[in-house]
Amino acid sequence: VSCSDEAVENGRVPLEVYNIVDYILGLEKEDRQSNPARNTYYKTFSSPMQRALTSYCQSGGNLLISGSYIGSDMNNSQGDREFTQNLLKYAYGQSITDSYSGNISGLGRTFSSPRLPNEYAYPVTAPECILPTGGAFPVLTYNSGNQSAAIAYQGNYRTFVMGFPFESIEKETDRNAIMASILQFLTTDSRK
């Protein structure tokens, strides 16, 4: 099932009925400079979304999140930082602004995400380093600087959070293999 974030935020789509939720943020972020109304329509995790994801995780849900601005967009208030650190289990490290390499390693693979404009995919000009918190661990690293590109957490619920858009992985074979690893992590019952 696919739906808009607004459908989740207003309660039309209850997350608790799904074993796994994939929240794809792409390049979404709050943009107060080009938005004269100064609203938070494009905020990565609005207050209603934070409530929905908190409820979902507290019910034992499994969450995959990916996006270029999931750290920096949530680093401006203590409440936003507490949400990402305490529930999603990551903290913002920094944005990578060089364009030298889009190579990422982990889960038995090295793959790439475009950093410069091209005719095949949108560029991820500033992927984010996200740091594990509260029992989470790094699972993917950016090859330039060996910094954390994705974290995973396993407790009463599970999270797999990527500091770049999943859909930006260039090769289909890499996307398929990475998704298979993510789904295995999110669905494996550790109590067996």
Q: Language model features by range: what are they?
A:
Residues V1-L27, S68, Y157, P165-I169, ...:
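Aromatic-Pro/Gly-enriched surface loop or interdomain linker
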Residues D5-R12, S47-A52, S144-A149:
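Alpha-helical scaffolding within the catalytic cores
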Residues N10-V13, Y41-P48, E170-D174:
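Extracytoplasmic/periplasmic, Sec-exported soluble proteins
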Residues V13-V17, Y56-S59, L131-T133, Y153-G155:
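Extracellular/periplasmic catalytic domains that process cell-envelope and extracellular macromolecules
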Residues K29-T125, C129-A136, T141-N143:
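A glycine-rich, often tryptophan-bearing local segment used as a flexible ligand/cofactor-contacting loop or short
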Residues N75, G79-T97, P132-F137, G145-K192:
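Extracellular ligand-binding/catalytic regions of CAZymes and related secreted enzymes
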